[in-house]
Amino acid sequence: FADNSIDLIFSNLCLQWVPDLPAALAEFRRVLREDGLLLFSSFGPDTLIELREAYLQAGERHPPLSPCAAIRQVGDAMIAAGFRNPVLDRDLFTLTYPDAMSLLRELRAIGAGDARVQRPRGLGGKSRQARMIAAYEALRHEDRLPSTWEVITAMAWAPGPGTPRREGNADVASFPADRIPRRTR
C-alpha cells in the first residue's frame, strides 16, 4: 500500500502470530493517513498459562506455544513506531474444558500452534504429552480444566507527516523531500 493511504486499520487476534511486532506497527504507521486510526487486539503472555505451566512441569523447556507480547511491550512498540495517544487495556477470560485433549484439539483446529521461526523441531512423543496431561489434571476444578486467555486491546492515532518518532534513544523526524526549500541564485 502507498504511504498515507489508509484511514483505518483493524486487526483482531492476529498480531500475536507476527514474528516482528515493531516492524508490523511501523508498517501500519507508514500506510495510515494523518489522524488515521489503528485498532487491534492480540493475545498476551498469560494466554494458555495453565497449559504452558503443565508443559514446563512435564520437563518441556520450550512449550510448543507461541510467545505473546506483554501489554507494556505492545505499548512501547506503538510509541516507538510513532503512534500518538495510544490506549491499551487487557482482559483475562477463563474458558474450561472437559480434558486437556479437548483444548489441544481446539487449538489445532484454529491453527494456534508455535509460530516461532526458531522453535525446537521434532516430535514430542506420547510420554511427554502424558506427563503434560498429568500436570494439567492437577488444576481440575469442578470437573473442568481452566484455560486462561489474556486479550490486549489497543488503539492509537497516526500523527501527521514530519512528526518525530522514536528509534532507539533518538527522536527521528521525517518529511517529504519536496518540502525542502530550494535556493536559487
Language model: regions and residue ranges:
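Short catalytic micro-motifs in class I SAM-dependent methyltransferases
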Residues: 13-17
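Structured loop/turn residues at beta-strand edges in well-structured enzyme cores
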Residues: 4, 81, 147
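Conserved catalytic/acceptor-binding region of the Class I
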Residues: 37-102, 106-123
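A short glycine-rich, Lys/Arg-flanked "PGG" loop and its adjoining helix->strand segment in the class I
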Residues: 22-37
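A short acidic, Gly/Pro-enriched loop at the edge of an enzyme's catalytic core
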Residues: 1-9
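C-terminal lobe and adjacent flexible extensions of AdoMet/dcAdoMet transferase-like proteins
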Residues: 101-185
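Residue-level recognition of oxygen-bearing side chains
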Residues: 20-23, 102
